[in-house]
């Protein structure tokens, strides 16, 4: 089963939870209800069935939305062929790079992008320069936007890595990375949400006393479930390993 409401509640009430806000009690009441549902579900399972509860991300308080394409425009790195731009196809050949959510950056490479203008010979220098700019970008509060900026070679592997972004920004807590093409008045803004996804505090519970939880990774979930189901599989097909 999937509980989507946990995501929605955290987006709009996480700051209340973390900073003793107006709706902190309602936040706790919601999780008590989720816990109750999980308990009822576990009671209906046979004794030899292992229950696994996992989330694919954690949450953190959101302070600022970062409109990266607006930032690229202000840096002179993004240009559009029309003043009434609204989509990726409106980018001109004079553009150096563009961004897609969440924190994916593409060099406007000639021969790869529809209106590519950056040559293969200039690719590495252009990407290195953009990476340096992203690493030094600070928010209105003086905090660095990026926890780290990762190249495609380090971030992706597999049969389709050729379509991966050239750079990926992993944000510090407090920043939500945006990338629309209609334009924004400011690089940094505040929206209706006060909570945003984080990479480092996802939830994992395996109802097995011998399960290895320490240093677990999302990659470990699939082989764990396959082992619990006694399903044969080629262990070399997975990056993770079973926790049971």
Give the residues covered by each predicted segment:
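Active-site His/acidic residue clusters
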Residues: 1-36, 40, 110-114
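A short beta-strand-to-alpha-helix junction
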Residues: 32, 80-101, 116-128, 196-199, ...
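Secreted, luminal/periplasmic, and some membrane-associated catalytic domains
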Residues: 40-175
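Short, solvent-exposed loop/turn segments at secondary-structure junctions
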Residues: 4-8, 16, 58-60, 111-113, ...
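Histidine-centered active-site/metal-ligand motif
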Residues: 8-12, 18, 57, 192-198
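Low-complexity, glycine/alanine/valine/leucine- and proline-rich hydrophobic stretches
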Residues: 168-222, 230
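A short acidic (Asp/Glu
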Residues: 10-14, 62-66, 180
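Short secondary-structure boundary/capping segments
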Residues: 15-19, 65-74, 184-186
